[in-house]
């Protein structure tokens, strides 16, 4: 292979491995469309993992009558993310600016950086492909960085950084033989699935507004 071709391949490989390269680096500016594609891939993967793990756990451990009583009880089905002001319907969502939706998505992602560790035993026993606490954590961190990069690009061209959002989920007993622990883990999975759905939805809306030809995908 010619030296020039080898250099081009190495550069391309480096860009693929580092999707959130800072704008002021020696590398070419990454197209906005690609930044959104990278963010959407991670958001979709997180949402799918959350949905599949929740469904698997529910079918294995939660009787149908227990599920209905759990979901109908505001005390047990309350997610910590309820404290993060988020639009509750399509109309409210459409009224939010791109930066507002990205900011909300960032807070939702950051609110799960610690709680996913409480689900270590759930992920370890899951048959869902890629469901491990380390893999989920890495996806969350990657998406956190990606959203910060998008916020900077849409605002002033420089990556945004900030304090990690502090959550208040209490540590749960992960003893799988404890009924109370099962319900608490079920509650965490329920909230995780719900929040990842919001993140994917908000990012898709911002992508549609920002990148021509990206709506409907």
Curated annotation (Swiss-Prot):
In this chain, Zn(2+) is annotated as bound at 44, 200
Q: What does this protein do?
A: Plays an important role in growth control. Its major role in stimulating body growth is to stimulate the liver and other tissues to secrete IGF1. It stimulates both the differentiation and proliferation of myoblasts. It also stimulates amino acid uptake and protein synthesis in muscle and other tissues.
Q: Could you tell me which residues carry Phosphoserine?
A: 132
Q: Where in the cell is it found?
A: Secreted
Between which residues do disulfide bridges form?
A: 79-191, 208-215
GO BP, one example?
Answer: response to nutrient levels
Quote the protein name from its UniProt record.
Somatotropin
């Amino acid at each position: 292979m010619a030296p020039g071709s080898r250099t081009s391949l190495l550069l391309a490989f480096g860009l693929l491995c580092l999707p959130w390269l800072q704008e002021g680096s020696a590398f070419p500016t990454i197209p906005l469309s690609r930044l959104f594609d990278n963010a959407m891939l991670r958001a979709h993967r997180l949402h799918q993992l959350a949905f599949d793990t929740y469904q698997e756990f529910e079918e294995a451990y939660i009787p149908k009558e227990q599920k209905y009583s759990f979901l109908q009880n505001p005390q047990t089905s309350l997610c910590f993310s309820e404290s993060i002001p988020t639009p509750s319907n399509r109309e409210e969502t459409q009224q939010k600016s791109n930066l507002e939706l990205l900011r909300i998505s960032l807070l939702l992602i950051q609110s799960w950086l610690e709680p996913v560790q409480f689900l270590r035993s759930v992920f370890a026993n899951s048959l869902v492909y890629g469901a491990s606490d380390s893999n989920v954590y890495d996806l969350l961190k990657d998406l956190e960085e990606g959203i910060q990069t998008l916020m900077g690009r849409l605002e002033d061209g420089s990556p945004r950084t900030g304090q990690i959002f502090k959550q208040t989920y209490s540590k749960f007993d992960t003893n799988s033989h404890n009924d109370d622990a099962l319900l608490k883990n079920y509650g965490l999975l329920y909230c995780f699935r719900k929040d990842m759905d919001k993140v994917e939805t908000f990012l898709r809306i911002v992508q549609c507004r920002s990148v021509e030809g990206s709506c409907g995908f």
